[in-house]
Amino acid sequence: MRLTTKGRFAVTAMLDLALHGAGGPVTLAGISERQKISLSYLEQLFGKLRRRELVESVRGPGGGYHLARDASQMSVADIVRAVEEPLDSTQCAGRENCHDNHRCMTHELWEELNGTVAGFLEGVKLSHLVDRQRNQTVTVVRSPRPRDTHPISA
């Protein structure tokens, strides 16, 4: 499987968009800042996501992006496929010419892996990732109380 940084970043950015989009369009600059993904890279990814109708853009002041459909209707596989080539673990990209123009001995194994991974990613909806993120335990670290610098005299 060739799940690249492009696919990982696209899923991360879409999750950020889903988490922050309730109040209106989300800017790529905001996603970039929160997720530490370069703005120019996000622009490339969101161009592909928009063409695949996973996001919609809103122009003008207060503009940005929002999901084109509900997060429960969007799988991780949809997102990954939108930004990169299909998931494929075979050496020959499914053409069955991996070994001297013939099928290699392990071709079926890699095809089965393709099916398993694709099925798994198809089953994970963006809404599941949103719920998981929102339900994570947050640890709050309190600063120690400042000590009085002036002693109290009696």
Can you annotate each of these PLM segments?
Residues 53-67:
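Beta-hairpin "wing" of winged helix-turn-helix
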